[in-house]
Amino acid sequence: MIPPVILASQSPRRRELLEKTGIPFSIIVRDTEELKEASMPPQELCLHNAAAKAEAVFREHPDSTVIGADTLVFLEGFPLGKPEDEEEARSMLRKLSGRTHHVCTAVAIRSPLGMKNLAVLTEVTFRELTEKDIRHYMELVDVMDKAGSYAFQEHGEMIISSVRGDTDNVIGLPVRDVMKCLNGLGYRA
């Protein structure tokens, strides 16, 4: 019998993306300490955080397949996580203005059927933003719970000029790659 799937994330965006697969799942989240070390390579940092989330839930539910994920925005190798306040959010958007950065989403899958890890990088380029553009964007979008202070799926056309790679990855879960891993463990949608 295929174990039940648990998404170890409270992100509504990850829930919506995983729902697209057709695989039934529940959501269980445990608090974990997220690293924000700028000295670690982006994929390694994201994988560490994703694994911590998956393993915290898997310890309590060892008969389930647990999916943990972590998304970070990196500008010139420096991580931009979720802002602490609105001024930090404005500062992040100013830094990203007119520049290309990377979004890394790492996924850790823990299951009695096996263990999988993956990290996907997507390149995102911002338009040149004025202070008025930044203010208007922040009025429309709750930037406080978003890595890099923006959401691709929420008025992204206002601030983003191009994306090279998986747009689902920018939103928070590289669905195609996750499905390949789940298929490898025997899951079918």
Curated annotation (Swiss-Prot):
Keywords: Cytoplasm, Hydrolase, Nucleotide metabolism. GO terms for cellular component: cytoplasm. Its EC number is 3.6.1.9. This is dTTP/UTP pyrophosphatase. Coiled coil: none annotated. It comes from the Bacteria. CDD domains: Maf. InterPro entries: ITPase-like_fam, Maf-like. The keyword Cell wall biogenesis/degradation does not apply. It is found in: Cytoplasm. The active site is at residue 70. Its cofactor is a divalent metal cation. SUPFAM superfamilies: ITPase-like. The record marks 13, 71, 153 as: Important for substrate specificity. It is an enzyme of class 3 (hydrolase). It catalyses: dTTP + H2O = dTMP + diphosphate + H(+); UTP + H2O = UMP + diphosphate + H(+). One of its GO terms (biological process) is nucleotide metabolic process. Gene3D superfamilies: 3.90.950.10. Pfam families: Maf (PF02545). Its main location: cytoplasm. GO terms for molecular function: dTTP diphosphatase activity; UTP diphosphatase activity. Belongs to the Maf family. YhdE subfamily. Nucleoside triphosphate pyrophosphatase that hydrolyzes dTTP and UTP. May have a dual role in cell division arrest and in preventing the incorporation of modified nucleotides into cellular nucleic acids.
